[in-house]
A protein has these predicted regions:
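Gram-negative bacterial Sec-dependent N-terminal signal peptides
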Residues: 2-22
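N-terminal maturation segment of proteins
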Residues: 23-245
C-alpha cells in the first residue's frame, strides 16, 4: 500500500508538471545539417535492417502485403530462432560501429535507443524461449495456420492459388517443427496446464473436419480457397484446375 501511494503521488506530480514541460518543449530545436545527414543514413539503415528481418518470415511478409516467398510458411525451429537473434545482434553491432549518437538529432537518438532496446528484449525472449507454452485455451499453432491463410493469403492470380496450396503442403513441415519443440520442452517438464488440453484437442480436430475430409459442411480453409479462386478473373477451366490441385 505504501508503495502504491508513493507511486500515485509521483504520477500526480508528473501530471501537474506536464503543462510546464510541454510549454518548454513546444518549439522544437532544428537539427543541424550534419545531424540531418546522419539521421537520413540511420533511417536508411533501419529500413535495411527491417527488410532483412522480415525476409526470415514469409508469414510476416504476407501480413504486410508482400508476396515474396508467398508459397512458404515460417521456419519455427530453434535453429531459425537462433538465426533471427544472430541477425539482430549483428545489426546492433553494425549500428554501433557505423553511427555516432552524438551526431544524431534528438529524434534519431531515441530511435537508436529503441532499436538497441528491441535487440535486448529479443535476447531475453530467446533466452526463455523454452519456457513458453505454445498451446493455450484460446489458440495454438494448429489453429493459427488456418486463420493465417483465411485472413492474410490473398488470391489475385493463379500463382497465388498455387502458393495457397503449397502452404497447405508446408503445414506438415511446420507442424513437425512444432511437435519437435513440444517434445523437447515436455522432456524438460515444460507442459501446458491440463485444462488447456481438452479445448486444444477440440479446436485442432475442427481443423481437419468437414469437406473434403468428411461429408460435413465445407472445412473453413476449403471454403475460403473455393471463394477466393471463384473470384479470380480467369476462365472456369483454370479455376477448376486450381480447385483440383488442393
Amino acid at each position: 500500500m505504501r508503495r502504491f501511494l508513493i507511486s500515485s503521488v509521483a504520477v500526480l506530480a508528473l501530471c501537474a508538471a506536464a503543462p510546464a514541460v510541454m510549454a518548454q518543449t513546444a518549439a522544437p530545436v532544428a537539427a543541424s545539417p550534419q545531424a540531418q545527414s546522419e539521421d537520413a543514413r540511420l533511417d536508411a539503415f533501419f529500413e535495411q535492417a527491417f527488410q532483412a528481418r522480415i525476409a526470415l518470415s514469409p508469414q510476416q511478409m504476407t501480413s504486410l502485403g508482400i508476396k515474396t516467398d508467398y508459397d512458404k510458411l515460417d521456419d519455427v525451429s530453434d535453429a531459425a530462432a537462433a538465426r533471427s537473434l544472430a541477425l539482430q545482434e549483428a545489426q546492433l553491432a553494425q549500428m554501433k560501429a557505423e553511427f555516432d549518437p552524438s551526431k544524431l538529432s534528438t529524434r534519431s537518438k531515441m530511435s537508436w535507443r529503441l532499436f538497441e532496446y528491441g535487440v535486448q528484449q529479443a535476447r531475453l525472449s530467446n533466452q526463455w524461449r523454452d519456457w513458453n507454452f505454445q498451446f493455450a485455451a484460446n489458440g495454438n499453432p494448429t489453429t493459427s495456420l488456418p486463420v493465417f491463410l483465411i485472413n492474410n493469403h490473398r488470391i489475385s492470380s493463379v500463382p497465388d492459388a498455387e502458393a495457397y496450396v503449397s502452404r497447405i503442403t508446408e503445414a506438415e513441415r511446420y507442424m513437425g517443427q512444432v511437435a519437435t519443440t513440444l517434445k523437447a520442452r515436455a522432456a524438460e517438464g515444460v507442459v501446458s496446464p491440463r485444462f488447456v488440453f481438452a479445448p486444444s484437442i477440440e479446436n485442432t480436430r475442427g481443423v481437419i473436419t468437414g469437406a473434403p475430409f468428411d461429408n460435413g459442411a465445407d472445412n473453413p480453409v476449403w471454403a475460403d480457397f473455393q471463394k477466393k479462386v471463384g473470384a479470380l478473373d480467369a476462365d472456369q477451366a483454370t479455376k477448376d484446375l486450381s480447385l483440383i490441385h488442393i
